[in-house]
């Protein structure tokens, strides 16, 4: 059997970085994709040091929809067995939509939605042909609710949830599984392109704990994964209550966190 590879976007930090270590620790060679080439090289070196796997880094700005064209074109001619695709890349924009920069919002859609679509479409034919493969889309508990002052971010996460659920059904008889991972607040640096800089959360699950759950549940073939009791409670309420009520609740919570 050929050696298995995992492709991970947003692999330079946070959950993506932790997922790189998880898949490398599981014996997967890894292709790591993100903008920060220096950080990617450090993650790749650590994967090799810890687990002895092969690594490849692809420095690309996924807000440019053509950034991965060369990489995608090469996929069809490679003999590598890409068993896992992790669509994790993303960033956030905080602020009322009418005041935020439209180009930044479009970049957000490109990073979180367009790149996931392009990569998923690129790897699926070979996975279907082998009757084996896993797609992991990293969404959010915000996939289930409207989020004032993060409207485009939450809409992108909702897209990933809906897309993943439809794709899982389409692929039911193929042996390819689709997992959508919906974490809440994690203890990780969150970089915004909206002028708020970086802020480190002090509460919530660690990126490492979240990644461990995502890794295990992906390989088990679980479809929707919401880690943690509080997050599952939020999702339950978001599905039970009217959208207007949920939006007001989320607005209040974010204000308490100093986000608005």
Task: Identify the residue ranges that each predicted region occupies.
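Active-site helix of classical SDR
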Residues: 120, 156
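Conserved glycine-rich Rossmann-like NAD(P)H-binding loop of the short-chain dehydrogenase/reductase
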Residues: 26-42
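Conserved glycine-rich cofactor-binding loop
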Residues: 10-13
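SDR active-site lid
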Residues: 168, 172-233, 240, 244
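Substrate-binding pocket helix/loop in short-chain dehydrogenase/reductase
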Residues: 96-98, 104-109
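Conserved NAD(P)H cofactor-binding loop of Rossmann-fold oxidoreductase domains
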Residues: 88-93
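Residue(s) in the substrate-gating loop at a strand-loop-helix junction
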Residues: 140
């Amino acid at each position: 059997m050929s050696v298995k590879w995992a492709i991970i976007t947003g692999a330079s930090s946070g959950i993506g970085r932790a997922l790189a270590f998880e898949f490398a620790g599981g014996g997967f060679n890894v292709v790591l994709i993100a903008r920060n080439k220096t950080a990617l090289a450090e993650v790749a070196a650590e994967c090799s040091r810890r687990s002895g796997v092969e690594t490849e880094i692809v420095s690309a700005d996924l807000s440019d929809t053509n950034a991965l064209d060369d990489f995608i074109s090469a996929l069809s001619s490679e003999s590598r067995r890409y068993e896992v695709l992790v669509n994790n890349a993303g960033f956030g924009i905080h602020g009322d939509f009418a005041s935020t920069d439209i180009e930044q919002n479009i970049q957000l859609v490109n990073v979180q939605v367009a790149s996931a679509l392009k990569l998923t479409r690129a790897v699926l034919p070979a996975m279907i042909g082998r009757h084996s493969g896993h797609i992991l889309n990293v969404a959010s508990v915000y996939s289930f609710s409207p989020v004032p002052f993060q409207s485009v971010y939450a809409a992108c996460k909702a897209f990933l949830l809906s897309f993943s659920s439809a794709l899982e059904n389409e692929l039911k008889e193929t042996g390819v599984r689709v997992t959508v991972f919906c974490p809440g607040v994690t203890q990780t640096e969150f970089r915004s392109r909206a002028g708020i800089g970086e802020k480190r959360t002090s509460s919530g699950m660690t990126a490492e704990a979240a990644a461990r759950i995502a890794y295990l549940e992906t390989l088990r073939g679980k479809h929707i994964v919401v880690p943690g009791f509080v997050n599952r409670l939020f999702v339950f309420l978001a599905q039970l209550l009217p959208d207007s009520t949920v939006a007001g609740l989320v607005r209040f919570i974010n204000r308490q966190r100093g986000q608005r």
